[in-house]
């Protein structure tokens, strides 16, 4: 295949805050396109209508643009293979699904959600992995026609071979073999007429002429389904490349429960996009020590997709901080540095909102750093002394911190109103006054007993940062309880 024919894509779902993992996969695809003189495409996969929102889509586009990634086709700029938003392509998918059914490779399933849940519970109880049991495979054509004509809700599933295995070549993992018995009869078309991720993914990649699909290793197990769909439609599958997931320093999967993972966190704290891309790009190249500081153009030049490691890429915050510091000191002139600072301040929603909250709480501008600095720190350096003024024992504070953390996870819409509502309910369940519950939280979140309003601050910091700070605070307070302080 000629390099000029290479077409890759990043296809995020707008269901939450843009994740650094999305930037990681996007950067690989971007560099792959640059390396081969190909095209980098952006597609929005919003088949999950209940969780996808225009607000999150805008955040995704803004985050990828902030990262310095430019696409030649996408929902914001159009292109010859549009639309580039799956919800705008709904009518495109159904003929492909009907083709699969007509050729005997798919079937209509009338099982209710209740029946499917009972089936899964029984399978789990028997120690078996939950998957569809094929009940509707045995329905006659006449019964299917009758039930469809009666308007009975149903989905369309794909048939799976009953023996043998799927063998394929992956650009990272090499030769892979997955037994068909491990593959579920995947739903292709939901009852509401929307395709599932798997169906839409294959159809869109085909119609958008995608030649290489690079995504996270969590999708490796789905390749047999995708290969089957390509075969059922008589289409040639792309080259698959499954990248190792980013992991924490302890080798656990990178997740918002352990570290801040949203791109907005890094923008708010003043990380340079060039440094973040530099940091992520180092996972895709082979370099000698001392050559780590690289621009996007240099990353593209050194990009080496043939020697990718299956070992998890370690997301080392300290290394990112080191690279960011080097970028500030070595790559920016004094004028560029000043421009970066001003741009960061002007475009920083967290700073803007923090200033609003600070205005009525300071008498001099010089007091602002002490009051609001906690909004921009990655580590508060929390010590037992910070809790000295809280009128509660370490044991009581620990109980509050441990009780509040899971309750805050229940919040669907993270804002000051929902945070206050949940904490009031938590205080009532604990038989305490709200003031007693928020006192240790105030210190945990801000590192001080004099700061900005708690609920507003928690909203500004975001769920993942608050989660991390409460976890650290619980560790500090636990040490106080253990030492008898």
Swiss-Prot record:
A motif ('KMSKS' region) lies at residues 253-257. A motif ('HIGH' region) lies at residues 12-22. It is an enzyme of class 6 (ligase). CDD domains: GluRS_core. InterPro entries: aa-tRNA-synth_I_cd-bd, aa-tRNA-synth_I_codon-bd_sub2, aa-tRNA-synth_I_CS, aa_tRNA-synth_I_cd-bd_sf, Glu-tRNA-ligase_bac/mito, Glu/Gln-tRNA-synth, Glu/Gln-tRNA-synth_Ib_cat-dom, GluQ/Sye. One of its GO terms (cellular component) is cytosol. One of its GO terms (biological process) is glutamyl-tRNA aminoacylation. Its EC number is 6.1.1.17. It catalyses: tRNA(Glu) + L-glutamate + ATP = L-glutamyl-tRNA(Glu) + AMP + diphosphate. One of its GO terms (molecular function) is glutamate-tRNA ligase activity. It is found in: Cytoplasm. Keywords: Aminoacyl-tRNA synthetase, ATP-binding, Cytoplasm, Ligase, Nucleotide-binding, Protein biosynthesis. ATP binds at residue 256. NCBIfam families: gltX_bact (TIGR00464). PANTHER family: GLUTAMATE--TRNA LIGASE, GLUTAMATE--TRNA LIGASE, MITOCHONDRIAL-RELATED. Catalyzes the attachment of glutamate to tRNA(Glu) in a two-step reaction: glutamate is first activated by ATP to form Glu-AMP and then transferred to the acceptor end of tRNA(Glu). Belongs to the class-I aminoacyl-tRNA synthetase family. Glutamate--tRNA ligase type 1 subfamily. Monomer. This is Glutamate--tRNA ligase. It comes from Sinorhizobium medicae (strain WSM419) (Ensifer medicae). The lineage of its organism: Bacteria, Pseudomonadati, Pseudomonadota, Alphaproteobacteria, Hyphomicrobiales.
